[in-house]
Regions:
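Acidic-basic catalytic patches of nuclease active cores, encompassing PD-(D/E)XK
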Residues: 1-45
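Acidic carboxylate-rich catalytic motifs and surrounding loops in phosphoryl-/glycosyl-chemistry enzymes
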Residues: 39-45, 111-116, 161-166
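Alpha-helix N-cap and loop-to-helix initiation/capping positions
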Residues: 13, 17, 83-91, 132-139, ...
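Non-catalytic C-terminal interaction segments of nucleic acid-processing enzymes
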Residues: 48, 128-189
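Hydrophobic, Leu/Ile/Phe/Ala-enriched alpha-helical segments that form helix-helix packing faces
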Residues: 21, 25-34, 96-103, 139-152, ...
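Catalytic cores of nucleic-acid endonucleases
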Residues: 76-133
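Charged, often glycine-rich, active-site loop that binds/positions anionic groups
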Residues: 43-60
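Active-site beta-strand-loop-beta-strand hairpin of nuclease catalytic cores
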Residues: 54, 61-71
């Protein structure tokens, strides 16, 4: 995870970054859930019919005898997190319904795994840091854990993996974040 995070501000929309994220998250998930080690795993699996009647792309999918058993939805948010935190929460609630109500599935787990800094930079359009977001505080104000638990019991889990960006207060532009050092990285438990 640390290696991924050090370059996580680079090419934030690239498929290479996404592939790296999925690889490290699968390793984390399997370390915490060794009972899934023998499953067949696929990245970017397209579920043919979701609970809304459309298709649904699953970041990391675990199969037993060809049947989907574990769905992992991954997010790695680095900057301007607080302004998007409510949208992420709403998306999670909707995606949970799309997966759990999909016809013909007997899922063991749906994991929403987000990787986020405890403190995140806020950039303007010129790439200058205009402030720092307290992501822990924002997440506390947008806690959907009780809703997810009430709706799905333990089937759906929201897992937030936090990390610290070292020396963040000394970074002034997005260029300063191209290679970072991190510490206090949470693990999937």
């Amino acid at each position: 995870m640390n290696t991924f995070l050090t370059s996580s501000f680079q090419n934030v929309r690239s498929s290479k970054r996404t592939d790296e994220l999925h690889t490290v998250l699968l390793a984390e998930v399997l370390e915490a859930n060794p009972q899934w080690a023998g499953y067949d795993w696929q990245f970017e699996y397209r579920l043919p019919v979701d609970g809304f009647g459309g298709t649904f792309d699953i970041d990391i999918a675990g199969f037993v005898n060809g049947e989907l058993k574990v769905a992992v939805l991954a997010k790695a948010m680095n900057s301007n997190v607080n302004k998007n935190i409510k949208n992420y929460a709403n998306t999670t609630i909707g995606e949970a319904a799309r997966l759990t109500y999909a016809p013909g599935l007997d899922l063991e787990a749906v994991l929403f795994v987000s990787v986020l800094p405890r403190t995140a930079p806020r950039f303007n359009k010129a790439g200058e840091v205009v402030g720092l977001d307290n992501v822990l505080s924002a997440k506390a104000r947008t806690n959907i854990g009780n809703i997810i638990e009430a709706q799905y019991g333990g089937l759906v889990q929201v897992i937030d993996l936090f990390f610290d960006i070292d020396n963040i207060s000394e970074m002034l532009t997005s260029a300063d974040f191209q290679t970072i050092t991190v510490s206090n990285v949470d693990k999937v438990s």
